[in-house]
């Protein structure tokens, strides 16, 4: 686990403890997050998940803003309970008052779109070409059948793929 991120989580907790004059339990930290989200706070599990790729590509802002953003969710939940809005006034108070950061809801990191392979299936219809995802293609290989809505014939794998 990146040590700087771990240290930043700890620093955020120390700032919150100084500000609120009370201790907070430390969360488990995971890097099992992919896609567009930079971070997620699981309130009831006391768990923070971070996107390692976005961290590596945006380290400075990620450490300053994203880590504080997610820690603020856990601190707000531990202080105010379940009945608060995710980015409501309690969370904003923590972002502004404790961390002296703008309470931004979303990041503006550039997210690389994943390359996806499509498997081409056909039927006898004109323009009867269908691009299946890897998951749907696997289901066909396991015996599932898909029918064309126009001609009601079974779609057949053409042996072709394309990358999108």
UniProtKB/Swiss-Prot annotation:
Residues 14-156 form the SprT-like domain. InterPro entries: SprT-like_domain, Uncharacterised_SprT. The keyword Zinc applies. Keywords: Cytoplasm, Metal-binding, Zinc. One of its GO terms (cellular component) is cytoplasm. HAMAP family: SprT. The gene is sprT. The active site is at 70. One of its GO terms (molecular function) is zinc ion binding. GO terms for biological process: response to stress. Binds 1 zinc ion. Its main location: cytoplasm. This is Protein SprT. It comes from Pseudomonas putida (strain W619). It comes from the Bacteria. It is found in: Cytoplasm.
